[in-house]
Amino acid sequence: VAIAVLAASLAACMTDSGDQGRGQGGLVYTDDRGVADQPFPADYRTQVLAFLRTYLNNPAGIRDAEMAEPVQRTVGGRRRYVNCLRYNAREIDGSYRGVAQRAIVYVDARLDRMIEKTDDLCAGAVYAPFPELEKLTR
């Protein structure tokens, strides 16, 4: 019974963003107060590196890493800072899967989630080399 209560309480901390009308899908781990005046994520590069170190199966040996600076975009009807990222990561077997493009959404200057289907979020993004990502280790 205690395990079921713990699991239910942890599930309450995570919500499906589709349920919140954001329309982008994925899990959301931060409380979105819905304020329109979002602070700029000054340490976005550090946040992205920390996230990708745990997100990627093999964070070593990344190629072709590029990132755009955060800009304000409308995500699910709310203004958020979003930055776009391109990289070619290794699979577990050491092969490369090809360049992936992702959008990273920030709430209250903290990385909230990564969106795989970037659609309009990354349209017109100006990318610059992201050598720190190519130097990432496990």
Segments the model singles out, each with a brief description of its role:
Residues V1-I3:
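Bacterial N-terminal signal peptides that target proteins for export
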Residues S9-A12:
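C-terminal motif of bacterial Sec signal peptides marking the signal peptidase cleavage site
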Residues M14-R138:
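Cystatin/cathelin-like cysteine-protease inhibitor module
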